[in-house]
């Protein structure tokens, strides 16, 4: 799911689609309009799921896509090596996600955790 917004409405910490990948905006620089052109914006963003740094250069009045990112809660049913079986607390559906290396000690069976869902992808997110 995604929606279209103008580049001038984007802010740091919000989300944007760069190369069809949902990203968190880290910085935005806007240049002033010149004699023969409109103002431009340079957006630096980091992918939510892959961690890659991406940059977008676009006119401030142009439209871009913003992903709809949902934070949901789930309960850990079981853990086998680096894969956790989770149950969504609202819909009670079960699914499996890989546990990131830095969260391995914090994800235990029976515990409630938060996960991110955007553009058909999911990721465990413990903040």
Swiss-Prot record:
One of its GO terms (biological process) is positive regulation of translational termination. It comes from Methanococcoides burtonii (strain DSM 6242 / NBRC 107633 / OCM 468 / ACE-M). Keywords: Cytoplasm, Hypusine, Initiation factor, Protein biosynthesis. Functions by promoting the formation of the first peptide bond. InterPro entries: IF5A-like, IF5A-like_N, NA-bd_OB-fold, Rib_uL2_dom2, Trans_elong_IF5A_hypusine_site, Transl_elong_IF5A_arc, Transl_elong_IF5A_C, Translation_prot_SH3-like_sf. It is found in: Cytoplasm. HAMAP family: eIF_5A. SUPFAM superfamilies: Nucleic acid-binding proteins, Translation proteins SH3-like domain. Its main location: cytoplasm. Belongs to the eIF-5A family. The lineage of its organism: Archaea, Methanobacteriati, Methanobacteriota, Stenosarchaea group, Methanomicrobia. This is Translation initiation factor 5A. PANTHER family: TRANSLATION INITIATION FACTOR 5A FAMILY MEMBER. It comes from the Archaea. The modification Hypusine is found at residue 35. One of its GO terms (molecular function) is translation elongation factor activity. GO terms for cellular component: cytoplasm.
